Structure formats: structure tokens, C-alpha cells
């Protein structure tokens, strides 16, 4: 009996121990981080692994991935996600570069990529030998929609597919017909059928099939963002017509993935852009196309080749009873009205700014699911000296991002700008295209009259979105002069347009901002990241491993009293457990290839000086002075790609979104948030943003802090869009601080855009009055305009508060005499 009691007691103790261990493991291992389920990440063996389409169907979520230029198939897969978040890799997968999706109601099938999926989840694949190309869109057939659908490829291959037999009939041959392998960084293949390259959208309605592309197949387009590129084209079943020669992406209608319910009369919508602003088209069956312009929050999507966009969309994320359209375009989530027609162009509104690169999205189980393009093994043309010799991850991977239905309203401020005319000749009496005027609390317009005549600019508004225009105001601008035109809250309208009374050479840029209600303090999710003033921290260099290891490598270090010592090599898989490994080869590789580059920026007493890869000079604000020695010693990562084909730049306590050089790079940099964190390194992995520089005891209750099993290494895990919660951008500095300046010579450009409150102080050491001329560039395109002049007396520190409706991208200064000058700005 005694032995029985003893055995029972031991068994109870063992069970309690196991229960405690399981509880501890539950604390350590989290199913999801910031809406990312690490085990749902997908990999391929290609230079990029983006998400082409995300569709709920047959009680599952179906996902396809793509590699960069693979018209004959690839290692990419078709994935089936179950409601309990299990990932099934379908054995029918044949890969490629697909981004098409359509639900064909009559046959009750989902067409996604080269696959047809019935209502029971059975999959059939259409081989690339029958239908070559990078499948970019589907459309309902013009004459037999019950039995046939259209497929379109990125190189203008067009096909009819029998929905029953999947028999394929080629209408126009794909541009990859020669069978040669296309290098990912070469000029896009061209096809004689249509202008432009890099197809994006396909749809049908009003007796027409519509096709878009967003690039140009020239060497020039690989380098520049402001070349002629792209097309919106129409096909009536016999002949092609170019509707507009610009970079277009989405083309759809209120019927979305199903096709329009009333195809003869329902509107067709198209989104695109040029170097000036976002384009929005709407087509009426009788009146044809009407076009409108919207501002850009992010310029990282620009580029004449069209590669930087993935697939911007307009998707219905509502319910069958209550449709709700969400649009993605140039870094903004937009609310898009399902009632948008040529005669009712009201209701489009900005929601919030985002950083993820999104290929497709949908509503599933009362959440939003965004399919992203996160970690490309090859950075393509996105190389710059600020990154040093760093590479992409060893293997491309991306993930789904699950969010609440309200997340599109909760990210970054919707500050944005766009032009209707940009350094161009305009005729007398010419009227601009309508530009969106509603949706922002702070609005202004910059106008530069570089012509020979004094010009009156007439501003008109369409108050109700019904094409009824009324005069808002007239502004006369002298030849060779510029002006900022603020708009009050009482000056209302859906759209605004501009007319000039004389011929001129002009720029007209609308610059809008929403109030930044963030504080300067970080959200609790960042607890445990080391403060910059501390001399002790757990850091490390990060690398997503290749060779199908599907883990994150961390070459850990510890900083004690300012001295950095390497502490070992660790790996983390999809269970988010940091485990020490003995791997000299990988350790050496990370140490060599992912070392933080030396002296890629210059931090002087006035600001951060950047000389970009084209030799252009830019200046950014300073932050906490403790960042300077750490930056100079290459202890803080400055620049890295953590979302495909754009960089995350971190300098002097501010994170910035940095477009690729071919999207104009630093000229279009955008501050995200400011912080006081000693971040050693950062990288993307399985859809997450990973950062090092941890004080573990301060983050012990934070699920975003992951500590190794031996307690000697740690990382922070979240998503890139968590960075909006670090705190609003702040800083101080300027292009001059007790600087010897020459009369009439402009200073370097200094960033002023996207900050909340801005104060300027001007001073000099001369014994006479000095006139300071203040110029701004509202667009980032070198559109320098005089803002104002200030006369500063000897020994005076002149202060100027910028008004709340002031918004521009860059600022610079000139003086009317040689002097030693200071131009100092505080952003708070």
C-alpha cells in the first residue's frame, strides 16, 4: 500500500511538472505575432516569393505564390488554409508568376493562377505547355460567359479557356514565346501587340475586355521614374484600342471577383499613376472614360519599369448584404464607393498609410487577410551604398497578414501629395484633370508660374461629385513667382481643378495632411528593446537562411559597459524558439556578408548628411545625441530591405520608408516614426519584422520579446506596420549651423515633410541685416518655390512657426550676402 501511495504521489508530481512545463512553453511560444502566423509562411526556390492571390472558397482560404519571371512554371505552390490555420500544399502545384483570380458562378469554380477549383475543393491544373505566360488576370467572356473565361498574361498572351474541359484556345501569343530564360534585372520583354510592358489587370464589361500594364521595356525605364510607360487598353473581340498611355494596374468593377452583375451598364474602374499623381479612371458604356487624380502617400511604388507595385487592388471586403470596397494605391488604404460612376464620383476617401507590400487581400472569417511580398532573395535593382554589401535572405519567403476589419483605419497618417501639372507647358484656357479635394483636414496647393506672363489660376470645385463645377477662388501669380494657397475647412468639394488664363510653364501640386495624433512615446509592444542611452544590450546580426532550412540565423552579441562581444550563433524556426547552434560556416557568412557598413552617412553638428548613389546631397534631422557615436562605430543598422523592392532606413532615432533609387530614392523618403532605441539590426522573416538590441528583463512580459533557451540571446518580433506605434516623427537640426555661406548659394535640401509641428530659427553673425530666402520643394522633383523671405537683424534669432496647413517635402535657404548663418528647425 505504501508503495502504491508513493507511486501515485510521484505520478502526480510528474504530471504537475509537465503541466508547468507546458504552461512555460505556452508563454514562450505564440501562435501569432501582430497578425502573422509564422507556420503559414511560404517559400520557393526563386528570386522572389510574392503572394499573387488570396481567395476564400469551399470553406478554405486559397493562396498562390509567384516568382519574378517564370512563364513556364516554377517551385511556387497553391496553398489551402483550413479554418484552424493548417497549411496544405497542394500536389497539383505547377508554380509560375500568377496573380489572377475569378469565381465563375455558372460552373461554381474558382480560377486562381493556372488552377480550377470546384466547390468541393478538387483542383485541376492547366499546364503551361497549353497556356504559357505569367497569368495576371481573368475576365468573363464577351459572348459565351457561361462556358468560357479569358486569361491574360503579363506579356500580352490572351487565351480562352473552356471552364468544363479546361481546353485552351490561344487568341494572342505570349511574349515569352522564344523560350529563352529572362534575367530578372533585364528590360521587360516587349510584345508588338500593345504599348508598355509588365501586364497587371484584366476585366470585361460594356462589351469590352480591358487590359493594363504598368511599365516600359527600355533601359531608361530601369533607371527613371518619370518616363512614358504603361497602358490602359481595350479589346472589342476583334481590335485593340489604347484608352490611355500611362502606368495602370487594377481594372475591375463593382462585381469584383465574380464579374459585373449587369455587364452592359455597370461601371468599369481602373487605377494607375504617372510621376505626378495617382490616376483613377471610370468608364460609362455611353460616355466612355473619365479620369481623376489622387495624391500619393508613398513613392516607393514609382519606377518606369513598373516592378515596384506588385498588384494594387480594389476588393470588396464587406458582406453580400453590405459591400465595402477597399482600395490599395501608393501606400494608402482607401475607402472606395461601390456607387462610383461617371455621373456620381463621390465618396472616395483616404483611410491610413501602410508599409507592407500587398499583392492581394480578402475578408475571411471576419478578419482581413493580406497576402504580402515580404522577403525577396534577390533585391533586383534595389541596391545602394547605404546598405553596404548586404544581400537579401538566403531563400525568398512571404506570409499572410491577418488583421481586424478596422486595421485599414489604424496605421499611419494619410499625409500625401500629388500634382496636376509638373514642370510642363500649359495652354491658355487649359483645365487640369480633377484632383481629389475631400478627406484631409489640412490642405494647401503650391503653384509655380515659370512662364513669361502673369497668370491667373482659377480654382473650381465639384461640390457633389456630379460634374457641376463652381468657382472657388482665383489667384494671380506673377511671372517667375510661386505661391502657397491654403484651403480652409469651409472650402469644400469632392474634386478640385485648375484653369490658367494665359500660356505658361507651371507646376501645381496639392499637398494634404491628416492630424498626427500619436504621442512621442512608444507603445508597450516595444518594451524590452534597449534604450539608446544604455550601455548594456543583447544584439546580433540577422539573416534568413537559405538551402530550404527555413530558419532565421542570429549571430548574437552582448554589449556590456559599451564593449561588444560575440556570444554565439542561434536559429529560430516557425515555433519562434531561439536555439543555440554550432555552425561555424553560417556564423562566418553572417559576420562577413551582413556586417553593418562603415560611414555611409555623415552626422555633423547640424543634421544627417546623405550623398546618394547619384551624388545628390540630402539632409535629415538629428535625434538623441547618443545615436551619433553608435552610428559612427557601425553598431546600428542604417538601411535594409524588409519589404520587397524598397528599404527601411533607420538613422538618428527615426525610421523612414526609402524608395529604390529607380523610384527616386532619398528624394521621396518618408519618416514613419521616431524612437530612442538602440536597434542593432533588423530584417524580415516569415512576414515579420525582427529587431535586435534587447534588455530582456524589461520585456519579460512582452510576447514580442523572444529569449533563447540559454538566456544569452534575444530578439523582438512584430510586423513592419507596428513601427507606426513607436511614436510620431520628431527631430531637430537644419542645413546650416554657424556655417560659412555664400550670397545666393542655396543650402542642401533638408527634410520638412510629414512632421506635425514645425518651428524655424534663423540667425547670423554679420553686423548688418541679412535677408534669408526660404524655398521649398513640395514634390521632391526639384520644384523649388519661394515660400517667403525674412530679414534678420544682427544678434537676432528670428523664429517662425509654420502654419498647420503648410506641407512640403524639402526646404532650403539662401542669403543675400556672405555670412555665417544658422537655419535651425525643431519638429515636435
Predicted regions, residues:
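Loop/turn-rich, solvent-exposed surfaces of beta-rich toroidal or solenoidal domains
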Residues: 268-270, 278, 294-341, 435-438, ...
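Beta-propeller domains
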Residues: 62-95, 113-127, 162, 172, ...
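Repeated scaffold domains used in trafficking and secretory/extracellular systems
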Residues: 46-53, 93-107, 130-147, 175-206, ...
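Beta-propeller blade signature
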Residues: 76-83, 222-238, 280-284, 335, ...
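Short glycine/acidic-enriched loop and turn motifs that connect beta-strands
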Residues: 68-72, 117, 156-157, 216-219, ...
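Noncatalytic modules at the cell exterior or secretory-pathway interfaces
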Residues: 489-506, 804-819
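Beta-strand-rich domains and repeat architectures in extracellular enzymes and scaffolds
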Residues: 40-76, 95-102, 434-436, 443, ...
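Blade-level signature of beta-propeller repeat domains, shared across WD40, Kelch, NHL, RCC1
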Residues: 360-422, 681-740
Amino acid at each position: 500500500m505504501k508503495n502504491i501511495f508513493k507511486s501515485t504521489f510521484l505520478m502526480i508530481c510528474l504530471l504537475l511538472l509537465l503541466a508547468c512545463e507546458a504552461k512555460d512553453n505556452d508563454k514562450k511560444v505564440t501562435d501569432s505575432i501582430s497578425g502573422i502566423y509564422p507556420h503559414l509562411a511560404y517559400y520557393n526556390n526563386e528570386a522572389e516569393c510574392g503572394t499573387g492571390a488570396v481567395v476564400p472558397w469551399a470553406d478554405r482560404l486559397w493562396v498562390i505564390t509567384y516568382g519574378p519571371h517564370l512563364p513556364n512554371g516554377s517551385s511556387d505552390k497553391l496553398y489551402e488554409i483550413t479554418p484552424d490555420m493548417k497549411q496544405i500544399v497542394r500536389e497539383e502545384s505547377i508554380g509560375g508568376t500568377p496573380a489572377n483570380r475569378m469565381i465563375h458562378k455558372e460552373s461554381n469554380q474558382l480560377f486562381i493562377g493556372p488552377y480550377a477549383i470546384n466547390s468541393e475543393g478538387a483542383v485541376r491544373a492547366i499546364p503551361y505547355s497549353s497556356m504559357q505566360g505569367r497569368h495576371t488576370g481573368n475576365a468573363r467572356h464577351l459572348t459565351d460567359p457561361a462556358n468560357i473565361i479569358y486569361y491574360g498574361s503579363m506579356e500580352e498572351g490572351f487565351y480562352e479557356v473552356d471552364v468544363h474541359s479546361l481546353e485552351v484556345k490561344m487568341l494572342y501569343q505570349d511574349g515569352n514565346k522564344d523560350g529563352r530564360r529572362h534575367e530578372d534585372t533585364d528590360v521587360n520583354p516587349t510584345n508588338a501587340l500593345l504599348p508598355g510592358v509588365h501586364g497587371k489587370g484584366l476585366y470585361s464589361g460594356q462589351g469590352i475586355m480591358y487590359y493594363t500594364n504598368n511599365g516600359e521595356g527600355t533601359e531608361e525605364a530601369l533607371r527613371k521614374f518619370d518616363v512614358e510607360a504603361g497602358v490602359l487598353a481595350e479589346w472589342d473581340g476583334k481590335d485593340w484600342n489604347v484608352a490611355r498611355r500611362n502606368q495602370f494596374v487594377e481594372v475591375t468593377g463593382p462585381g469584383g471577383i465574380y464579374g459585373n452583375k449587369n455587364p452592359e451598364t455597370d461601371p468599369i474602374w481602373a487605377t494607375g499613376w504617372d510621376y505626378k499623381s495617382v490616376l483613377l479612371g471610370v468608364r460609362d458604356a455611353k460616355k466612355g472614360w473619365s479620369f481623376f487624380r489622387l495624391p500619393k502617400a508613398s513613392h516607393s511604388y514609382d519606377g518606369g519599369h513598373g516592378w515596384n507595385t506588385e498588384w494594387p487592388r480594389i476588393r470588396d471586403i464587406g458582406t453580400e448584404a453590405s459591400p465595402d470596397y477597399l482600395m490599395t494605391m501608393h501606400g494608402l488604404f482607401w475607402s472606395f464607393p461601390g456607387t462610383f460612376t461617371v455621373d456620381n464620383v463621390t465618396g472616395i476617401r483616404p483611410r491610413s498609410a501602410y508599409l507592407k507590400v500587398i499583392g492581394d487581400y480578402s475578408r475571411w472569417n471576419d478578419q482581413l487577410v493580406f497576402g504580402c511580398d515580404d522577403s525577396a532573395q534577390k533585391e533586383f535593382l534595389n541596391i545602394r551604398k547605404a546598405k553596404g554589401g548586404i544581400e537579401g535572405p538566403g531563400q525568398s519567403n512571404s506570409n499572410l497578414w491577418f488583421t481586424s476589419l478596422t486595421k485599414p483605419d489604424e496605421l499611419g497618417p494619410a499625409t500625401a501629395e500629388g500634382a496636376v501639372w509638373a514642370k510642363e507647358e500649359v495652354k491658355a484656357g487649359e483645365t487640369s484633370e480633377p484632383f481629389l479635394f475631400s478627406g484631409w483636414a489640412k490642405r494647401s496647393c503650391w503653384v509655380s508660374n515659370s512662364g513669361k506672363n502673369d497668370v491667373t489660376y482659377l480654382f473650381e470645385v465639384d461640390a457633389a461629385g456630379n460634374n457641376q463645377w463652381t468657382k472657388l477662388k482665383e489667384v494671380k501669380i506673377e511671372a517667375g513667382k510661386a505661391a502657397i494657397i491654403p484651403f480652409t475647412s469651409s472650402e469644400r468639394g469632392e474634386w478640385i481643378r485648375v484653369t490658367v488664363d494665359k500660356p505658361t510653364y507651371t507646376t501645381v501640386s496639392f499637398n494634404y495632411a491628416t492630424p498626427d495624433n500619436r504621442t512621442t512615446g512608444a507603445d508597450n509592444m516595444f518594451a524590452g528593446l534597449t534604450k539608446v542611452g544604455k550601455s548594456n544590450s543583447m544584439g546580433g546580426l540577422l539573416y534568413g537562411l537559405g538551402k530550404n532550412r527555413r530558419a532565421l540565423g542570429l549571430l548574437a552579441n552582448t554589449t556590456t559597459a559599451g564593449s561588444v562581444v560575440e556570444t554565439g550563433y542561434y536559429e529560430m524556426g516557425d515555433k519562434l524558439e531561439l536555439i543555440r547552434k554550432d555552425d561555424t560556416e553560417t556564423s562566418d557568412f553572417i559576420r562577413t556578408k551582413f556586417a553593418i557598413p562603415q560611414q555611409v552617412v555623415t552626422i555633423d553638428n547640424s543634421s544627417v548628411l546623405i550623398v546618394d548613389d547619384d551624388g545628390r546631397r540630402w539632409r535629415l534631422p538629428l535625434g538623441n545625441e547618443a545615436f551619433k557615436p553608435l552610428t559612427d562605430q557601425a553598431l546600428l543598422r542604417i538601411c535594409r530591405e524588409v519589404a520587397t523592392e524598397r528599404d527601411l532606413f533607420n538613422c538618428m532615432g527615426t525610421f523612414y520608408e526609402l524608395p529604390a533609387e529607380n523610384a527616386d530614392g532619398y528624394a521621396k523618403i518618408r519618416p514613419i516614426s521616431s524612437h530612442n532605441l538602440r536597434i542593432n539590426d533588423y530584417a524580415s522573416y516569415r512576414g515579420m519584422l525582427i529587431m535586435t538590441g534587447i534588455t530582456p528583463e524589461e520585456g519579460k512580459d512582452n510576447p514580442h520579446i523572444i529569449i533563447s533557451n540559454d538566456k544569452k540571446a534575444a530578439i523582438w518580433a512584430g510586423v513592419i506596420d507596428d513601427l507606426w506605434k513607436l511614436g510620431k516623427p520628431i527631430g531637430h537640426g537644419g542645413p546650416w549651423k554657424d556655417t560659412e555661406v555664400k550670397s545666393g548659394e542655396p543650402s542642401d535640401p533638408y527634410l520638412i515633410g510629414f512632421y506635425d509641428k514645425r518651428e524655424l530659427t534663423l540667425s547670423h553673425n554679420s553686423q548688418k541685416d541679412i535677408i534669408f530666402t526660404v524655398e521649398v520643394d513640395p514634390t521632391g522633383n526639384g520644384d523649388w518655390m519661394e515660400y517667403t523671405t525674412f530679414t534678420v537683424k544682427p544678434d537676432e534669432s528670428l523664429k517662425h512657426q509654420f502654419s498647420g496647413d503648410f506641407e512640403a517635402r524639402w526646404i532650403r535657404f539662401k542669403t543675400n550676402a556672405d555670412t555665417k548663418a544658422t537655419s535651425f528647425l525643431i519638429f515636435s
